[in-house]
Amino acid sequence: VAVIGTGSSGIQSIPIIAEQADQLTVFQRTPNFSIPTHNGPIDEERLAEYRADPASYREEARHSGIGVPRTPPDTSALAVSEEERQAAFEAVWQRGELAFLQPFNDMGTNAEANDTMRGFIHDKIRSIVDDPEVAELLCPTDHYFATKRPCLDTGYFETFNLAHVRLVDLHADPISTITETGIDTSGRDGDESMEFDAIVFATGFDAMTGAIVGVDITGRDGLSLRDAWAHGPETYLGLMSVGFPNLFMITGPGSPSVLSNMMVSIEQHVDLITDTLEHLRDTNADTIEPTELAQTKWVQHSNDIANLTLLPTANSWYMGANIPGKPSVFLPYPGGVGAY
């Protein structure tokens, strides 16, 4: 089996495919950060916390940063000792939850602080993967930690210690042809033809906008949403767009969406949409859409917040950078669920 891609789809599927395939070859363009997910039963103490007051827990989630109740860290990664930093990072590694990935308050805004976490994960990869050359290939160096969506895995890095698993670096050995029987590469050390029974394309998604513009949505005066968003999506709150009366989106571009606990965001958006529909009914109005000014100010507000962070520095699907020709703009709202 060949797997092309080492983003979330590849990272989650590669360990399982390795259990079943006689030979697995992984073609990697860009290594990504991942931490072990530690799947298993939730411990009783945590369950008791959830069950003690579900209504308060859910209300806290609505006003939290990412839709999961937690106390935000108030300390810089650069203000503590190396021992304290390592202990905090180890706790993140052992917990394995996206909601608790940043134990310090400047991980997302300060490159030097972020580098401390990046170095910790690099060291973890080197300690797990037996072959030093393979380990270095698996260490992400082109983006800061969590500027692409971090992955959770079940033995991903350990998989590359298996004798029947091979990693191909596409920078050194790019794919030249997909053939009837497999994959041909042409690299620095010459050409190679590899035969496979199956090829898995774990090459990503047109995130945030692809599913929406994939539908032929037409607004006022025959304007298509695809054309309206040709230079990047523009919305008010990520829920409505100028020129498309009565078109509502849930977790659309310009909303917290993928930077949040999606269940909480979905509920918020459904509440706003139903409140809006009730208002239309109660005022005998037929249509609603945002003004140009409201939409422009919302887009600018979202961009201003993103530019305070390290998020726009990565060529990520948050930016639309994984799709050739797609405008590079920061797609989700980065200000947090509570602020939103």
Question: Where would I find each of the regions flagged by the language model?
Answer:
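Aromatic pocket-lining residues of Rossmann-like dinucleotide-binding sites
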Residues: 13-17
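N-terminal FAD-binding dinucleotide-binding subdomain shared by FAD-dependent oxidases/monooxygenases
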Residues: 6, 20-340
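Hydrophobic/small residue at the entry helix of a nucleotide-binding pocket
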Residues: 9
